[in-house]
Amino acid sequence: MANKMKTRKSAKKRYSFTVNGKVKYKKQNLRHILTKKSSKRKRNLRKSGNLSCFEVKRIKTLLPYD
């Protein structure tokens, strides 16, 4: 009997899949030390990011059952 692949929990916390199969993630640098960052920069950091098609393949190997 073959072993099941394990899900990488660190990747599961950081990435999620959209309905179309794209990978979504939350941008960094919005936790603390926000006073020196401009409002425009903070507003852009609130948007979710999308990975390129090359990185999607790597993330799908880390998250086999999602």
Curated annotation (Swiss-Prot):
The gene is rpmI. This is Large ribosomal subunit protein bL35. It holds the Pfam family Ribosomal_L35p. GO terms for biological process: translation. It comes from the Bacteria. Keywords: Ribonucleoprotein, Ribosomal protein. HAMAP family: Ribosomal_bL35. Belongs to the bacterial ribosomal protein bL35 family.
